[in-house]
């Protein structure tokens, strides 16, 4: 998967196209990610110990990883990702500027 938890991304297709946010969770086996403030859904929650009132809760739902594109740290624009070996480690870099994404 070309994105990781904590990456700043932009949604490139679907109803939330153009929105930007941080990846809160990634599910590589399902090829899905949860992006902050994107794909908001309403869930009906039964009353429980943690939520004695119950009711309708809004939260982010996963979207397919192909719908998001990482943002270039230098320009702030969406970019494709490449991989290269630096000091014996495989790191991701932004193809738009050449900036390394992994610390």
Swiss-Prot record:
Gene Ontology CC terms, in alphabetical order: ribonucleoprotein complex; ribosome
GO molecular function annotations of the record: rRNA binding; structural constituent of ribosome
Q: Which GO terms describe its biological process?
A: translation
Q: Which Gene3D superfamilies match?
A: 2.30.30.30
Against PANTHER family, the record matches this protein to:
MITOCHONDRIAL RIBOSOMAL PROTEIN L24 (PTHR12903)
Function as written in the Swiss-Prot or TrEMBL entry: One of two assembly initiator proteins, it binds directly to the 5'-end of the 23S rRNA, where it nucleates assembly of the 50S subunit.
Any idea what this protein is called? Answer: Large ribosomal subunit protein uL24
Provenance organism? Geobacillus sp. (strain WCH70)
Q: Which gene encodes it?
A: rplX
